[in-house]
């Protein structure tokens, strides 16, 4: 191409995308699987090892919907992924489901063992007080050190525990 001359595209060569590059999911056909994976990643503090079964499901969805070429999962790096029927995977899936339920504004008592900061009825097993979750002296005496940190807005280190209101009825629960 030279200056002053109209551009020519004869030198332009079309090449296929590199392996791993595939079209965007404009219609949202696999959005729910992708969202579940992203929630799992957030819940596990960016430890993708606990969410590999979900990334495998996402790639399988993309292959099923024609958004990427069919390929063996071994070639995509999933040779060592544990079967979803295993206990650890079930626990991770349950935790991701609990995370998803909390992110959709459902209550802490929807059949899953989810606890919110300030919730005296959940996994923390604290005795009830008149001012549950308020941070009052009566409330603090019923809590252990981790629960006090939760009441002060710190990150909870318990399984399936989220910061927000005690029952997530206002829909403003903030996922940690």
From Swiss-Prot:
Any single GO BP term: mitochondrial cytochrome c oxidase assembly
Compartment(s) of residence: Cytoplasm; Mitochondrion intermembrane space
Region (Disordered): 1-20, 124-176
Cystine connections: 30-61, 40-51
Annotated CHCH domain residues: 27-69
InterPro entries in UniProt: CHCH, COX19
The keyword Transport is assigned to this record: no
Location of the motif Cx9C motif 2: 51-61
Short sequence motif named Cx9C motif 1, residue ranges: 30-40
Comp. bias intervals (Polar residues): 167-176
Single GO cellular component term: mitochondrial intermembrane space
Keyword field contains Cell membrane: no
Pfam families: CHCH (PF06747)
Record key words, sorted: Cytoplasm, Disulfide bond, Mitochondrion
Function text: Required for the assembly of mitochondrial cytochrome c oxidase.
Family, per entry: Belongs to the COX19 family.
Name this protein carries in UniProt: Cytochrome c oxidase assembly protein COX19
Lineage: Eukaryota, Fungi, Dikarya, Basidiomycota, Ustilaginomycotina
């Amino acid at each position: 191409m030279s200056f002053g001359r109209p551009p020519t595209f004869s030198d332009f060569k079309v090449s296929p995308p590199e392996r791993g590059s595939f079209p965007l999911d404009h219609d949202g056909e696999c959005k729910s699987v992708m969202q579940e994976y992203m929630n799992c990643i957030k819940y596990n503090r960016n430890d993708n090892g606990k969410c590999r079964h979900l990334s495998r499901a996402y790639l399988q969805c993309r292959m099923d919907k024609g958004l990427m070429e069919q390929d063996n999962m071994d070639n995509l790096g999933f040779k060592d992924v544990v079967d979803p029927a295993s206990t650890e995977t079930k626990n991770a899936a349950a935790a991701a489901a609990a995370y998803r339920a909390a992110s959709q504004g459902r209550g802490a008592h929807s059949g899953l063992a989810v606890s919110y900061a300030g919730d005296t009825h959940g996994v923390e097993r604290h005795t009830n007080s008149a001012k549950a979750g308020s941070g009052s002296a009566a409330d603090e005496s019923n809590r252990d050190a981790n629960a006090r940190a939760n009441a002060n807005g710190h990150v909870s280190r318990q399984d399936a525990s989220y910061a927000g209101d005690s029952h997530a009825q206002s829909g403003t629960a903030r996922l940690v």
